[in-house]
Curated annotation (Swiss-Prot):
Location in or out of the cell: Cytoplasm
Record protein name field: Regulatory protein RecX
Main subcellular location: cytoplasm
Region annotation Disordered: where it falls in the sequence: 1-44
Basic and acidic residues compositional bias, start-end: 13-24
Length: 187
């Protein structure tokens, strides 16, 4: 459990994670300096001989297998997740709030952020609560994103307006927020 707990602490020290994201990362085998994912196809013959010797040693391979099984044991992962919750290192609500703030600063709208949070395993109730608690003016954000991409004065021709609209829809803004850009500029 200590290895998994140290992995969880390292992951959570870098940034907040959702529970399902952390669970998935803990279940995956960790990267290893001894792994063959970084070796080139033109390896020296001595490297191949050494790797064959390690693989042919049944004691070492059994130890490695038992460590790998222990590492991805669902009970151990569940204990680590519980420990993280008890120490307030893991919180899906906090993760959702920080993710919304981060992605909105990068110019993404509600629909895109909601979709990404659902992909990361955050449940709908927490996502909805996080959006309700956020103090982001989505109409103003849509206007700023459009002005940053196109120009300070937004286009008025139909063809150019359609381009702005497609871009903002792609970024995850609602149709009403996009329309408010032009109604606010007329008034």
């Amino acid at each position: 459990m200590n290895d998994q707990l140290s992995r969880a602490m390292r992951l959570l020290s870098q940034r907040d994670h959702s529970e399902s994201e952390l669970r998935r990362k803990l279940a995956a085998p960790p990267f290893s300096a001894k792994g063959n994912w970084g070796k080139r196809s033109g390896a020296k013959s001595s490297d191949v001989v050494e790797s064959n010797l390690v693989e042919s040693n049944p004691v070492e391979s059994n130890l490695a297998e038992s460590n790998a099984i222990e590492e991805s044991d669902p009970q151990v992962i569940e204990q680590v997740i519980d420990y993280c919750y008890q120490h307030n290192w893991l919180d899906d609500s906090r993760f959702a709030a920080s993710y919304i703030n981060s992605r909105s600063r990068k110019g993404y709208g509600v629909q895109r952020i909601r979709s990404e949070l659902m992909q990361k395993g955050v449940d709908k109730e927490r996502i909805l609560a996080a959006f309700e608690n956020s103090e982001i003016d989505w109409c103003q954000l849509a206007k700023e994103v459009a002005q940053r991409k196109f120009s300070e004065t937004l286009p008025v021709e139909w063809k150019e307006k359609a381009k702005v609209q497609r871009y903002l829809l792609y970024r995850g803004f609602f149709q009403e927020e996009i329309q408010s850009i032009y109604t606010d500029s007329v008034e």
